[in-house]
Amino acid sequence: METKVEIKDNLKTETNENAYIIAITKAEGKTIHVKITEEELEDLIGDALDGGDYWIGRIRAVDKEETKKYTTWSECIVHNLRIMLLDIESDEAYELSRTAFLEGIGKYILAFGEDLCTAEEESICMRKDKPAEIMKTDHVLDTGNIDANIADNMLQFGLFGELVYG
């Protein structure tokens, strides 16, 4: 069976936090549903950009006017704006979006295992635009154990599908 990462966004948790679900299907067919809140995602993106400073030379906005509303690059990404990451040596540009970063988290978990996920009792997220539509999660991302290096690796998985730097 093929591995797969699917993102479900536009969700609210039971405590009314904005959230995302990363559905990760492993080769043996088992799927886990990992919940990450918007706040956790913003922190991880900030850590990833800090952790990638050895290969990211510059960061550029794709939607320059829209990005002026926010104070950090990670806020821009969380609010579904895109940024360009320029390679420190070649100036080659790579586009980072919220979906790409979330997919990178899932691909990292597929590659390195579920150590960064904590199983939890089933929790519920509701679609913001369709509150009657309920999605269940069975894991949370253990962001307290993710440092800047791991976050950078997740970023690379999101951009390239594999580790390219470091």
Please tell me what each predicted stretch does.
Residues 32-40, 68, 72, 76, ...:
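Alpha-helix boundary/N-cap detector
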Residues 90-144:
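Amphipathic protein-protein interaction modules
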Residues 142-165:
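Acidic, proline/glycine-rich low-complexity IDRs
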